[in-house]
From Swiss-Prot:
InterPro entries per record: Ribosomal_uS19, Ribosomal_uS19_bac-type, Ribosomal_uS19_CS, Ribosomal_uS19_SF
Cellular component GO terms held in the UniProt record: cytoplasm; small ribosomal subunit
Reported function: Protein S19 forms a complex with S13 that binds strongly to the 16S ribosomal RNA.
Source organism, top-level taxon: Bacteria
The keyword Plastid is assigned to this record: no
Gene: rpsS
Alphabetized SUPFAM superfamilies for the sequence: Ribosomal protein S19
Record's protein name: Small ribosomal subunit protein uS19
Organism: Pseudomonas putida (strain ATCC 47054 / DSM 6125 / CFBP 8728 / NCIMB 11950 / KT2440)
GO MF term list: rRNA binding; structural constituent of ribosome
Keywords: Ribonucleoprotein, Ribosomal protein, RNA-binding, rRNA-binding
Source taxonomy: Bacteria, Pseudomonadati, Pseudomonadota, Gammaproteobacteria, Pseudomonadales
GO BP annotation list: ribosomal small subunit assembly; translation
Keyword Ribosomal protein: yes
Family: Belongs to the universal ribosomal protein uS19 family.
Length: 91
């Protein structure tokens, strides 16, 4: 269920401050964050945000289509290696 419009988007304050500093300085280095729950705002477009997936930081280049989504949607936490092949079926 989506968040109520009267509440507005959620973003952690520490991430918002990092984004504002990066925009001010025109910094191209990735902004490192553990906040997967924060929503992508229009001022983040063009920035690279390194989102933690539980093991490492995954670089996510934010574009206009991502606005309104959560950061965690773009950094998967599970690795799918496929189903194990049956040895009898190979013969």
């Amino acid at each position: 269920m989506p968040r109520s419009l009267k509440k507005g988007p959620f973003i952690d304050l520490h991430l918002l401050k990092k984004v504002e500093v990066a925009v001010e300085k025109n910094d191209r280095k990735p902004v490192k964050t553990w906040s997967r729950r924060s929503m992508i705002l229009p001022q983040m477009v063009g920035l690279t945000i390194a989102v933690h997936n539980g093991r490492q930081h995954v670089p996510v280049l934010v574009n206009e289509d991502m606005v309104g989504h959560k950061l965690g949607e773009f950094a998967g936490t599970r690795t799918y290696r496929g189903h194990v092949a049956d040895k009898k079926a190979k013969r």
